[in-house]
């Protein structure tokens, strides 16, 4: 696989909504592999295709080696808890910039795997935070961007 260049904020592609993936083929699996290699090189724990300029709804997350790699195609939040949790968040597109955000503590995500099979997953803790952050990125919402000028 390949480490690809990561777009840096304020690249306008980072605020554009990504299109749904419709082809579940070798090209999609290769893109997922490139995202994983790029995320590890950054380093980071989550990355979406828009981070590398590909406006498709594909996310790769690896919280730790023990947790393994998770790949989400066309993810969407199906349910979110009313209880909230605060976490510091950053982005591979804005190195060194973090922001403390309050988000739902638990959620259920509907997505497809790289073969196109439909999945439903419950998440809490860091996984819930990472999923919400990356889904925001895919719809063109980069939560930390308002802090960029403070960090520069």
Enumerate the language-model features and the residues they cover.
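Positively charged
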Residues: 1-147
């Amino acid at each position: 696989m390949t480490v690809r260049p990561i777009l840096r904020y304020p690249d306008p592609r980072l605020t554009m909504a990504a299109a749904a993936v419709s082809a579940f083929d070798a090209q999609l699996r290769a893109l997922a592999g490139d995202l994983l290699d790029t995320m590890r090189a950054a380093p980071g724990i989550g990355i979406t295709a828009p981070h590398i300029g590909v406006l498709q709804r594909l996310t790769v997350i690896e919280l730790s080696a023990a947790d393994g790699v998770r790949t989400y195609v066309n993810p969407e939040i199906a349910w979110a808890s009313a209880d909230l949790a605060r976490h510091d968040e950053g982005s591979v597109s804005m190195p060194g910039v973090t922001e403390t955000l309050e988000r739902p503590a638990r959620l259920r995500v509907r997505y497809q795997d790289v073969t196109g099979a439909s999945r439903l997953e419950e998440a809490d803790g860091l996984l819930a935070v990472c999923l919400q952050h990356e889904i925001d990125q895919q719809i063109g919402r980069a939560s930390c961007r308002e802090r960029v000028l403070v960090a520069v």
